[in-house]
Amino acid sequence: MKKVLLLITAILAVAVGFPVSQDQEREKRSISDSDELASGFFVFPYPYPFRPLPPIPFPRFPWFRRNFPIPIPESAPTTPLPSEK
């Protein structure tokens, strides 16, 4: 744990001490209307761009379908209730 903390501290110290040049021309272009994109990479509008969507019943809980393979009947049970005897 101490080694990880020391490594993170060293990386931060190097990053803070590294000189950064100020590009005045780029700052002027960025402030004005420019054709630069807001982000450097394209983000897909939905999470599944190259594969089909997940199955509908339990898309967020795949473990539920694996651990509970009990079939659910579509109709009501045919046995009469105890009060109807």
From Swiss-Prot:
InterPro entries for the chain: FDC-SP (IPR029187)
Tissues in which the UniProt entry reports expression: Abundantly expressed in tonsil, lymph node, and trachea; strong expression in prostate; lower expression in thyroid, stomach, and colon.
Keyword annotations from UniProtKB, A to Z: Glycoprotein, Secreted, Signal
GO CC aspect terms: extracellular region
Positions of region (O-glycosylated at one site): 75-83
Keyword Secreted applies: yes
Subcellular location: Secreted
Free-text description of this protein's post-translational modifications in UniProt: O-glycosylated with core 1 or possibly core 8 glycans.
Segment forming the signal sequence: 1-17
UniProt-listed Pfam families: FDC-SP
UniProt key word Signal: yes
Described function: Can bind to the surface of B-lymphoma cells, but not T-lymphoma cells, consistent with a function as a secreted mediator acting upon B-cells.
Protein name: Follicular dendritic cell secreted peptide
Protein species of origin: Homo sapiens
